[in-house]
């Protein structure tokens, strides 16, 4: 609850797909991309904050899928825009979709609710 506003911030779950941008060097593995260390520290911070619940490359690694908890799409765009890889054009937001999590090990019995 925000003391100043007297409101409770409601978080929703989202599936966020990130795609390679023009700054991505296809000849280099993921951890050899420019600013890998800065990107990793930034993403770890988002996990520590509870913003990113889970995530990582999918398929052949051309895309990354994240389970994100946020107030809305604007918060997602704003926070991910600060990623060093976003600033360097390595990753772009592909899609952001609301995700109704009916099965969630973090919430016992979630499918029955």
What are these regions (language model features)?
Residues 2-113:
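Conserved, structured core segments of small domains
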């Amino acid at each position: 609850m925000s003391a100043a506003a007297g409101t409770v911030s409601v978080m929703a779950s989202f599936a966020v797909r990130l795609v390679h941008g023009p700054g991505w060097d296809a000849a280099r593995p993921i951890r050899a991309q420019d600013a890998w260390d800065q990107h990793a520290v930034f993403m770890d911070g988002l996990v520590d904050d509870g913003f990113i619940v889970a995530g990582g490359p999918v398929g052949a690694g051309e895309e990354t899928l994240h389970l994100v908890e946020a107030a809305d799409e604007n918060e997602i765009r704003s926070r991910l825009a600060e990623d060093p890889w976003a600033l360097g054009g390595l990753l772009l937001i592909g899609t952001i979709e609301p995700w109704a999590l009916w099965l969630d090990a973090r919430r016992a019995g979630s499918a029955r609710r």
